[in-house]
From Swiss-Prot:
EC numbers: 2.7.1.4
Catalytic activity, reaction form: D-fructose + ATP = D-fructose 6-phosphate + ADP + H(+)
Keywords: ATP-binding, Carbohydrate metabolism, Kinase, Nucleotide-binding, Transferase
Function: May play an important role in maintaining the flux of carbon towards starch formation.
Gene3D superfamilies hit by this protein: 3.40.1190.20
Any single GO BP term: starch biosynthetic process
A Pfam family: PfkB
Gene Ontology CC annotations of this record: cytosol
The protein's name in its UniProt record: Fructokinase-2
Top-rank lineage group of the source organism: Eukaryota
InterPro entries: Carboh/pur_kinase_PfkB_CS, PfkB_Carbo_kinase, PfkB_dom, Ribo/fructo_kinase, Ribokinase-like
CDD domains found in the cross-reference section: bac_FRK
Gene Ontology molecular function: ATP binding; fructokinase activity
Length: 328
């Protein structure tokens, strides 16, 4: 499957947070026991934006960074990776967000965040680049931007403007419970914008959280369905993903790779999916083509787990195709 050339493909605008992850140099130890940390750029919406450009698509990032060395470093990383940066604001009074990430021996993660408040939380509706948002064919976002005002109001305004301009709305809640005042508030706010999205991707863990069920099955997933939804995805880690549309549902298998760090795997998956559908949304109604796209997306997610950090591990289309052909 050829990826559209960057010049011809529609724009995918990603809204939300970008931060610095501090990742221990040794896996399987607590933060206190870690001998040292490597800094890695992160933040799910930013990861998605770079995943798109790495695959040959066009993307832009909308959000706020601290007017500090880390903030300007992150903006530079977006630009270096071909992401349009004219939706970025800098805050002189607040720092860029930081997260310390514990890598367990199996590559899964635990988080400790420093953001009280961080610059991303202070984005206001008046600071939004509305022309950029209106130019989006796909508008992608998470839920971390819903936690506090004024960022929540900016999120709602951006979504409304994108929807009015005809964009496909893509939602990956990206649950980070330590950032929320309570689990109840997280569930309430994540669900508060549920019915606006055209495409929703949740992980198996998020499915359990949102439904209150410990079953990862079709009945549980379909309890999250809403009438305007075009595609609901439940990612299953190395087992692939389940997909649901109005007309059909099924499973796409995953890839067995040597997992080092799962950071960014879901973002890589989403970026691949959006890159493939931005110029041809009829794929969402064609099961055979959708399965092909989801297999490609699963390959991208799998490759991302084979290296430390999200952005350095995001694959090119040729790397994903190599894995699809069994050459990796």
């Amino acid at each position: 499957m050829a990826v559209n050339g960057a010049s011809s493909s529609g724009l995918i605008v990603s809204f939300g947070e970008m931060l610095i992850d501090f990742v221990p140099t040794v896996s399987g130890v607590s933060l206190a026991e870690a001998p040292g940390f490597l800094k890695a750029p992160g933040g799910a919406p930013a990861n998605v934006a770079i995943a798109v450009t790495r695959l040959g698509g066009r993307s832009a990032f909308v959000g706020k960074l601290g007017d500090d060395e880390f903030g300007h470093m992150l903006a530079g990383i977006l630009k270096t990776n071909g992401v349009q940066a004219d939706g970025i604001n800098f805050d002189k009074g607040a720092r860029t967000a930081l997260a310390f990430v514990t890598l367990r021996a199996d590559g899964e993660r635990e988080f400790m965040f420093y953001r009280n408040p961080s610059a991303d939380m202070l984005l206001t509706p008046a600071e939004l680049n509305l022309d950029l948002i209106r130019s989006a064919k796909v508008f992608h976002y998470g839920s971390i931007s819903l936690i506090v005002e004024p960022c929540r109001a900016a999120h709602m305004k951006a979504m409304e403007v994108a929807k009015e301009a005809g964009a496909l709305l893509s939602y990956d809640p990206n649950l980070r419970l330590p950032l929320w005042p309570s689990a109840e508030e997280a569930k309430k706010q994540i669900k508060s914008i549920w019915d606006s999205a055209d495409v929703i991707k949740v992980s198996d863990v998020e499915l359990e959280f949102l439904t209150g069920s410990n079953k990862i099955d079709d009945e549980s997933a379909m309890s999250l369905w809403h009438p305007n939804l075009k595609l609901l995805l439940v990612t299953l880690g190395e087992k692939g993903c389940n997909y649901y549309t109005k007309k059909f549902h099924g499973t796409v298998g995953g890839f067995h790779v040597k997992t080092v760090d799962t950071t960014g795997a879901g973002d890589s998956f989403v970026g691949a999916l959006l890159t493939k559908i931005v110029d041809d949304q009829t794929i969402l109604a064609d099961e055979a083509r959708l399965k092909e796209v989801l297999r490609f997306s699963c390959a991208c997610g799998a490759i991302t787990t084979t290296k430390k950090g999200a952005i350095p591990a995001l694959p090119t289309a040729s790397e994903a195709l190599t894995l699809l052909k069994g050459g990796a």
